From Swiss-Prot:
Motif (Nuclear export signal): 16-22
Region (Disordered) location: 440-512
GO cellular component: host cell nucleus; host cell plasma membrane; host multivesicular body; membrane; viral nucleocapsid; virion membrane
Similarity comment: family membership: Belongs to the primate lentivirus group gag polyprotein family.
Species of the source: Human immunodeficiency virus type 1 group N (isolate YBF30)
Lipid-conjugated positions (N-myristoyl glycine): G2
Ranges of biased composition (kind: Basic and acidic residues): 473-491
Note: HIV-1 lineages are divided in three main groups, M (for Major), O (for Outlier), and N (for New, or Non-M, Non-O). The vast majority of strains found worldwide belong to the group M. Group O seems to be endemic to and largely confined to Cameroon and neighboring countries in West Central Africa, where these viruses represent a small minority of HIV-1 strains. The group N is represented by a limited number of isolates from Cameroonian persons. The group M is further subdivided in 9 clades or subtypes (A to D, F to H, J and K).
Gene Ontology molecular function: any one: structural molecule activity
Ranges for region Interaction with host CALM1: 8-43
Protein name according to UniProt: Gag polyprotein
Length: 512
């Protein structure tokens, strides 16, 4: 568990593991929270060894408390864990983290020094209303002093420009680094940018346009200024070209103040928006999800391009609600439309999480195959080639259906399966009733039948008795035979048989 796991032992460890993380929750503090707190202290450049005692925890709490208002969630979690650890070291009975924070707050109020006279209290109240934003800091004498930007801040700004060029995330980074800066500080940040001089020239043009517009909307008052009154800043004063650092500080700390630093920042942000638009020529309308692209990557590209769009927040919200679903691939679009128009981004990400995976691809392939097979089946049915349900197989050995003769369990029947006689097979059977094809050959049922062979059915002979004979039928048959013989004699007398060609051609060459 590491060296910091031995901070608590015995009864203190039992008390630590009995405290709930949240009021009414089920999770409690464990040893891993101590290890995490020690690592976080090292990350914040604090001494983890102070966690061993109550006084050390108090020092850490006093050091972290001023950063709670602007700190991250990790910093708040670290402060809460140290507050609980302080109560455990001090043997203060608590049940959850909120009770520990309340105990710490009570102790701080008890040790808070009271003002000696009402005037000091009023002065403290007045000082609390004065802005102490960096880089303008108030001294002990009540004077506002300017502190220039640190090299670390300038280095971070230059590194962002070198790595990100002018991507959409440069603007939030500039806003964070230039918080409370004067126009001179902002010019210092812009002058540290070595490359991208074309972009810097575009930025200067935007600043000049905004300065000219400021001069048109804020004309110079007529007449001399009263003694001791500051002059109104011009556009060039706000840009820091015709004003000194003392004048800028005086404008920013006057009553009422003139925020020349914030105004200049707003002009710079307008110019950066144009530069980002130039460096990101892709329109939000062109961001479409690929057929195999995960929905998460598509959303990342969509919002990154949306940040570069020069539009109001209402227009961006409309783009998100409409184009995000409209430009998705057909698979994701079908799922997103099923969610409805009021779906959140988390619900969309969850619904489209499996799209593009192996399971989804297999399902899509199965649906495509089924759609291809359906029209093929209908075509065969229309042409008459669709046989429908197959006839059940029949055994030639026992005559039952459901199996073949080679799988029949009945005793093997010998001989021909057609006539029952032995000595030949069914394909060689020559008994009467055998069908023949148009070539006169016997047709075997195991071979294909010619398509032009008419199918005949075997009919049974009638069982009625034969007709009675009265004598005239035999006479009629004999008379027919005599007439046929007389006709043949007549034909022979008219056309004698030609034994040679002499009667036709005279001398027959063949007889010579």
């Amino acid at each position: 568990m590491g060296a910091r796991a031995s901070v608590l032992t015995g009864g203190k460890l039992d008390q630590w593991e009995s405290i709930y993380l949240r009021p009414g929750g089920k999770k409690k503090y464990r040893m891993k929270h101590l290890v995490w707190a020690s690592r976080e202290l090292e990350r914040f450049a604090c001494n983890p060894g102070l966690m061993d005692t109550a006084d050390g925890c108090a020092k850490l709490l006093n050091q972290l408390e001023p950063a709670l208002k602007t700190g991250s969630e990790e910093l708040r979690s670290l402060y809460n864990a140290l507050a609980v650890l302080y109560c455990v070291h001090s043997r203060i009975q608590i049940h959850n983290t909120q009770e520990a924070l309340d105990k710490i707050k009570e102790k701080q109020e008890q040790h808070k020094p009271e003002p000696k006279n009402p005037e000091a209290g009023a002065a403290a109240a007045t000082d609390s209303n004065i802005s102490r934003n960096y880089p303008l800091v108030q001294t002990a004498q009540g004077q506002m002093v300017h502190q220039p930007l640190t090299p670390r801040t300038l280095n971070a700004w230059v590194k962002v420009i070198e790595e990100k060029a002018f991507s959409p995330e440069v603007i939030p980074m500039f806003m964070a680094l230039s918080e409370g800066a004067t126009p001179s500080d902002l010019n210092t940040m812009l002058n540290t940018v070595g490359g991208h001089q074309a972009a810097m020239q575009m930025l200067k043009e935007v600043i000049n346009e905004e300065a000219a517009d400021w001069d048109r909307t804020h004309p110079v008052p007529v007449g001399p200024l009263p003694p001791g009154q500051l002059r109104d800043p011009r556009g060039s004063d706000i840009a820091g070209t015709t004003s000194t650092l003392a004048e800028q500080v005086a404008w920013m700390t006057a009553n009422p103040p003139v925020p020349v630093g914030d105004i200049y920042r707003r002009w710079i942000v307008l110019g950066l928006n144009r530069i980002v638009r130039m460096y990101s020529p892709v329109s939000i309308l062109e961001i479409k999800q690929g057929p195999k692209e995960p929905f998460r990557d598509y959303v990342d590209r969509f919002y990154k391009t949306l940040r570069a769009e020069q539009a109001t927040q209402e227009v961006k919200n409309w783009m998100t609600e409409t184009l995000l679903v409209q430009n998705a691939n057909p698979d994701c679009k079908q799922l997103l439309k099923a969610l409805g128009p009021g779906a959140t981004l988390e619900e969309m990400m969850t619904a489209c999480q499996g799209v593009g995976g192996p399971a989804h691809k297999a399902r899509v392939l199965a649906e495509a195959m089924s759609q291809v097979q359906q029209p093929t089946t209908s075509v065969f049915a229309q042409r008459g080639n669709f046989k429908g349900i197959r006839k059940p197989i029949k055994c030639f050995n026992c005559g039952k259906e459901g199996h073949l003769a080679r799988n029949c369990k009945a005793p093997r029947r010998g001989g021909c399966w057609k006539c029952g006689q032995e000595g030949h097979q069914m394909k060689d059977c020559k008994n009467e009733g055998r069908q023949a094809n148009f070539l006169g050959k016997s047709w075997s049922p195991f071979k294909g039948r010619p398509g032009n062979f008419p199918q005949t059915t075997t009919r049974k002979e009638p069982t009625a008795p034969p007709l009675e004979s009265y004598g005239f039928q035999e006479e009629k048959s004999t008379q027919g035979k005599e007439m046929q013989e007389n006709q043949e004699r007549t034909e022979n007398s008219l056309y004698p048989p030609l034994t040679s060609l002499r009667s036709l051609f005279g001398n027959d060459p063949s007889s010579q």
